[in-house]
Swiss-Prot record:
Disulfide bonds: none annotated. One of its GO terms (cellular component) is Lsm1-7-Pat1 complex. It comes from Schizosaccharomyces pombe (strain 972 / ATCC 24843) (Fission yeast). Residues 23-102 form the Sm domain. Residues 1-23 are annotated as: Disordered. The keyword Transport does not apply. This is LSM complex subunit lsm7.
Amino acid sequence: MSSLQKRPGPGNSSQPTERPRKESILDLSRYQDQRIQATFTGGRQITGILKGFDQLMNLVLDDVEEQLRNPEDGKLTGAIRKLGLVVVRGTTLVLIAPMDGSEEIPNPFVQAE
């Protein structure tokens, strides 16, 4: 029998190769300890204080409140459900927005009835 030798190449390296660290798409560090709003796939919305995040956009939020929607038409009801400390998975996020320094405006593309 012949002995097999490892050849250098991808997957056969005995030493770990150093890769550049992946950066996050957004720099959320400036919103650390500030209240933000997050919208998820499916339309759910929460607000909370950003306590931590990683490069995959997973978030840790504290003092979280969910804005409840009407199940029939999907419009916000004005009711709020307190959730406390929440870990949000980055793959479910659609929108992240700071609460301070922003205001809601009417959609300019919707025709007035």
